[in-house]
Amino acid sequence: MQEHAEAAMIEHLASTLQPAFDREKSGRANAPFSNSITSQERDKIIDRSVRQSGRYFTMRAAGVPEEEIIASFDKPTEMQVFAYERSGDSYITTLRDTVMTPRDSIIYAKTFLRSGFMAMDSETGEVRAYVGGPDFLTFKYDMVTQGRRQVGSTIKPYLYSMAMNEGFTPCDQLLHVQPALRNPDGSIWTPRNAGSSMIGEMVSIGWGLKHSDNWVTAWLMGQLSSDGYSNSFVNYLHSMGVTSTIEPTLALCLGSCDISVEEMVGAFTTFSQKGMRQEPLYVTKIVDKYGNVVANFTSKVHEVLPEDAAYKTLYMMREVMNGGTGSRMRFRYGIDADMGGKTGTTQNHSDGWFMCFTPKLSTCLLYTSPSPRDS
């Protein structure tokens, strides 16, 4: 499974996502960054990366003056850079010989999408596949545990499961209009919606998750929050194994917080395991050189939800895959297995998430554009 996961990540990046990202950024003055930042901000990001590079620290340790170090980054130099290469019917990663300035090589490296993938056995917690990126030798940044990104709509199943635990059902109806929620400071928050269907009509809570509807989600947030605070939802996320710092804002229901792939995978086991959350297990046993077992390890299990609340959430997440935002997975790859899932995008599609689970496997995939947070 590990080999398949690594190959699939490289294949999808090299053949589909990276070319699309390159076309999107082509001709933009601030490429590979968003045009929402100024050229001065872009230069600051690059300058910071220069001072965090191995070349900079090596020259500084050798006693080279600061001015000379910085000047060296603008001199064309022979080097090897990361690239995708076609090999038969698939793609591989390689190092390509070239000549460019070290500063340009930093910008070049930031044009490549980052990614992280993890799969674990939902029943035992054993990690089956772990891919921290397309090539760790080049991008020494683990997007499974180190990299945290805004989770967007993949946070919604947590809110909906919390609602199920509070007595709501997938069949409960509400008027599909834009909600207006009051923040603690008295200001009004009115979330936008990506779609325009069913406006002014009665819809179900299950319909809201199936179509990743922001208005239904925000309405639920209002029902579960008090005085504009979402402390109860924050506490619930922590009970699901999320250790990241989370601000208790109303917009949290739409995924404004940063969470890691590892945290997401562990939390999603709750829905397929009748409300019991499994912690990821990386090592099952230790043996000495003679083959004697020194220690055995098992995953820690936490009861998060009553079984009926977990089942109601599971039902809604199945619908996401059967006819909602995740249904393309079935049509494109011809998968008819029983599964649930959730998609999520954030920050003008700079981050893309896909959560999916079967009765025995929980997975999370993240694709993300280069970010100043990685610099």
Q: What name fits each language-model region?
A:
Residues 1-62, 220-223, 234, 238-239, ...:
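Non-catalytic, structured segments within soluble enzyme domains
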Residues 2-15, 46-121, 126, 130, ...:
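A penicillin-recognizing enzyme superfamily signal
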Residues 9-20, 162, 166-170, 216, ...:
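A generic secondary-structure signal for well-formed alpha-helical elements
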Residues 21-34, 175-180, 281-292:
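Acidic/histidine-enriched alpha-helical segments
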Residues 112, 137-146, 214-218, 245-252, ...:
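Glycine- and acidic
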Residues 140-162:
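Active/ligand-binding-proximal structured segments within catalytic/core domains
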Residues 168-231, 277, 289-314, 318-319:
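Conserved catalytic neighborhood of penicillin-recognizing serine enzymes
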Residues 188-193, 225-266, 275, 279-282:
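Mid-domain, small-residue-enriched loop/turn segments at the edges of structured enzyme/sensor domains
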